[in-house]
Each structure stands twice: as structure tokens, then as C-alpha cells.
């Protein structure tokens, strides 16, 4: 075991001197005891970032450096940061170095995995292009997710990002028997706490809590930048284990990918790198690429990632969101205007898109129904000014029909969620893709022109609409 001594502390950056010829490798984890954090031994982890000459390294701390003094002993673990992986992590909250922070005792994991590793080699990657069915109508129809793909989730505060994430976790557990991993990167601790409590209270079909199928890895706003820039990698290591060792289709949620970049830029400046555009780190695209390339389908299983993306000052050309966009297969945009209409999930069908919506992938029927739905909704949007000024009576008969169908489509895009059952009083619905396509096709073909539009609101498939209509008629 190689032992070094602290020579300098600059905020979250710590310089350590080692005996000549015994320098730890870049990305190795070093451990020491910081009495200011707790009385536990080896409670502070440092990650080697740079070699400074023959005997000194510059490291980034994963926790507070308050209380460190020069001359303190630091030992080299000889390997990268290792986190516990496997079923023992489900239902637990861990921090960036895999220590449980939910006060529920230690994690008795049989295996640990390094947070840094190479993406799967080409020979192991799956070349099959498969749709990842979520059971949520608007997503499956308009912006289908790719198995092993990356999805950007855009939305302001209070439009339903968390509920959508909860429902996806629930549906993955139900439909695919799969697990989810949630990385809380630089967001509010209160939100992380709320998510844990909501997942503990929401129930799966078999009555067990949603949390029993998810692992939560948190590095929130109050953490040093070292922890925030690495916590997404810790979560990815947990997800990769379920994919590679247990052959599962895993959902990885990252909230928020912008904070990952932001933390990287804080660390970069402290390491003395010359900043590039807008003050971001010069290694921005390399760091993002190293993270995103590990999210993929292999011949054993897949990691599908849903990433919430904060857009600073609503500027889509900012280097941080722009770098993330390059990796996305689909975007799901949540709209406040739609949530104000009481339509949940508040996904904007005209703004959301996916590379999977291609007739060669999803088939001619799915593609044409999705495009017809968008055309109808776009026409309705164009007519809204006329309706607001002159009223419905001034429209042609054709346009009146378009408006009536568009309003039914809009209502039918809503759906009762399992995890929101306690708010809506309605049982959640998981709608198979073929039922979704058939339902929208019937509306577009005018087969349901006689049905009142309120019968389309918060239902599952088209059979529910017909049942609701006949119930009202009787």
C-alpha cells in the first residue's frame, strides 16, 4: 500500500506527494480520514486528475475538504472509485462513492464495479434497431424511444417531469420486469427526497413499492463539484452491471445532464485548464462522449437513458445543451400550455421528435398515423386565431371537422398514470402500441365522430372510449 502526504489544498482540489516511482495512476481513488466529515476512517475519497512532476499528483475531492491540513497521510487504493452493484442496490440511495445515505444500514453487495470503463466493443453492440415500448400513448406514437437509445426530456418546473419519470420506472418494471437507475446530478436535495418518498408510496401491480425496482444514486447541489461530475458515472456503472451480468433492459435516468457539464467546468478551472467557449472546459465534448457512448444496447441487454436537460437562459446554442443534443435519439418536450389544459402527460406532440419515427423502422401504418395526427393538430393550431376572433361558425365544414377531431386527439393523448392514481382517482393504464395506433386511426378516419370529446379524456385504449360513451348513453 502506497502512502502519500497532502502538500496543498485549494478548495476541492488537493495536491498529494508520493515517494518517487510510486505515483498512483490517473483516475485512481485515494483515501484518507477527514475528521470534519465524520469519525469514520477513510471517509474522504480523492480521484487523481493530473501528475505534477515526478512525485506529486493533483486530485479532486468527492466530499468536503474542510479540515484537511498539509502533511495528512493519504493512501492509494490502486484502482478507480468502486461502487457496489447488483440487486442489493435496489431500493437504496447511494452517493458517488457507493456509500448509502438513506440511513438504512450498509449495502451488502457481493460485487463492486469501477465507475470508469470503456464502452462495449463493437462486436458486442447490438445492431438491431428496436423500439422501446413504454405503454404511454403519446410517446409510443409520436416520439418512440429506441432500446439502448438516449432521450432528452425538456420541461420547465411543475409540468410533470418527475411524474413522467416515475411512470416510466413503473412501466419498465411492469412490462419488461426491468430495473431502473436514477442519477440525481446537482439538483435540489428536496426533490431527491420527494422522489424517494413518492417511489416508496407508489405501488407496482404486485403491490410492492416502485422503489423496490430502482436504485438511486445522488450527488446533489450541495456536493462539491468532484462528486457532481462523477455521480452520473457511478449510476452508469450500476446500470451496466444489470445489462451485462443479468441481461436486463435497464432504464437510466439522469436529472440533470447540464449539471454534469457544469460540475466539469468548475473542476476544469481549478485544475488550471484554459477554458473554451462561454467558460466551459476544453474537454467538454470528450467528457460527454465518454459518458454517452457507454449507454447502448449489447447482445446481452440494453441501457436506455432518459436525460432531463436544463437549457441555460433558454439558449439552445449554449455549448452544454448543444453537446448533449448531438447524442440524442429522441426528444420529449413537456409544454406548460398543454398542462394548463389539464392534459397529462403534457408532452407536446408537435415539438417532440424521434429518429425512430421512420417507416422502415416502425412500419408504414404507424408512421402515417403519427404524421396524420401531427397534421391534424398543426391545422387546429393554425385555426385557433380565427376561432378566437370570429368563432367556430366562420369555419368551413371541413375545418370544423378537423377541429372536432383534433380536440378528440388532444384529449386521447392524455392517459391515467399508475403513479398518479392517488391524485386522479383513476386506475393507471398501460396501452400496447398496436392499440394506440388503431385508436388514433379510428379517430382520423371519422369512425368516432359521433362520440363526445369528453369520453376521450384520461382513458387507456379506444375500447375504454367506447365503453365510456355507451355508459353515458345508457
UniProtKB/Swiss-Prot annotation:
EC number assigned by the record: 7.1.2.2
SUPFAM superfamilies in the record: C-terminal domain of alpha and beta subunits of F1 ATP synthase (SSF47917), N-terminal domain of alpha and beta subunits of F1 ATP synthase (SSF50615), P-loop containing nucleoside triphosphate hydrolases (SSF52540)
GO cellular component: plasma membrane; proton-transporting ATP synthase complex
Molecular-function annotations in GO: ATP binding; ATP hydrolysis activity; proton-transporting ATP synthase activity, rotational mechanism
Recorded coiled-coil stretches: none
Binding, ATP: 155-162
Main location: membrane
Reaction it catalyzes: ATP + H2O + 4 H(+)(in) = ADP + phosphate + 5 H(+)(out)
UniProt xrefs under Gene3D superfamilies: 2.40.10.170, Bovine Mitochondrial F1-atpase, Atp Synthase Beta Chain, Chain D, domain 3, P-loop containing nucleotide triphosphate hydrolases
UniProt keyword terms in alphabetical order: ATP synthesis, ATP-binding, Cell inner membrane, Cell membrane, CF(1), Hydrogen ion transport, Ion transport, Membrane, Nucleotide-binding, Translocase, Transport
Membrane-protein topology: Peripheral membrane protein
Compartment(s): Cell inner membrane
One Pfam family named in its UniProt record: ATP-synt_VA_C
UniProt subunit comment: F-type ATPases have 2 components, CF(1) - the catalytic core - and CF(0) - the membrane proton channel. CF(1) has five subunits: alpha(3), beta(3), gamma(1), delta(1), epsilon(1). CF(0) has three main subunits: a(1), b(2) and c(9-12). The alpha and beta chains form an alternating ring which encloses part of the gamma chain. CF(1) is attached to CF(0) by a central stalk formed by the gamma and epsilon chains, while a peripheral stalk is formed by the delta and b chains.
Family the entry assigns: Belongs to the ATPase alpha/beta chains family.
Summary of the function given for this chain in its UniProt record: Produces ATP from ADP in the presence of a proton gradient across the membrane. The catalytic sites are hosted primarily by the beta subunits.
The protein's name in its UniProt record: ATP synthase subunit beta
Lineage of source species: Bacteria, Pseudomonadati, Myxococcota, Polyangia, Polyangiales
